[in-house]
Amino acid sequence: MKQALLISFMLALLTATSAIAEKVRLAVTSSFHNSGLSDHIIPHIETDLEIDIQLIVVGTGQALKLGENGDVDAILVHSKPDEEEFVKKGFANHRREIMFNEYVIVGPSSDPAQISSAKNLLEAFSKLSKAMVNFVSRGDFSGTHKKEMEIWNKINFVPDDIGKKYISVGSAMGKAINIAVAFDAYILSDKATWLNHKNKGNLQIQFEGDRLLHNQYAFLPINPAAHAHVKDQTVEKIEGWLVSEKARNLINSYLIENVQVFSFNAR
């Protein structure tokens, strides 16, 4: 009888232990979350790998800082030069491209800067620089903010030169869009977050489709040589899932307003 009770107790203990999913901390860019894609795929990863993913939703700059400090086990971000520098410094062994979408310029329906007629992105930003219209910037060192600054640099323009019309908000994509709505302003946004955003006000997409608006997302596992406590084996499984056929199907099938907003391109 005692032996049977002992066996039952051990089985119950084993079951309870296995039911406690391993927790993994993943820093992700706010556009990945605000677009709704995280809610679309994270539950599948957790179920398939029997883990509990704790998402830390921040801009790319902050995500990289969390990775550098060893506060997360992996990051999913979208600023290739910074990612490559991150790997070069030894904070990650590699970067793995997973998917992409595109940026768009959103602005007032009347399009006072007339960027919708621009032949390319640089002409669109040149029109914005001359029109003295409100422009909201993320201003948070996120991937989107860095893309915006990259474009201003390409036309040799310092956006602060337009004074109070240039509104730097230091906020995530969703909050920045809300501020753009309030100021009837232009803003650079990833297309998925814009389409998924409920409060569009008087704004609409005014320019899209230029190759410079390509927005690549990559997965970077934190290097255990830099931070021995990271859960590198579990992170390796997450990376394997993210490049799987199931991931391809889920990412490519994610639609907003009947539009495919992300494209899988992992290799």
Residues covered by each model-derived region:
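Serine endopeptidase catalytic core focused on the charge-relay Asp
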Residues: I105
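Sec/Tat signal peptide C-region and signal peptidase I cleavage site
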Residues: T17-A21
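Hydrophobic anchor at the start of a short beta-strand
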Residues: I53
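Exported/periplasmic ABC-transporter solute-binding proteins
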Residues: E22-E50, G61, K65-D71, K80, ...
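Bacterial N-terminal signal peptides
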Residues: A4-T15
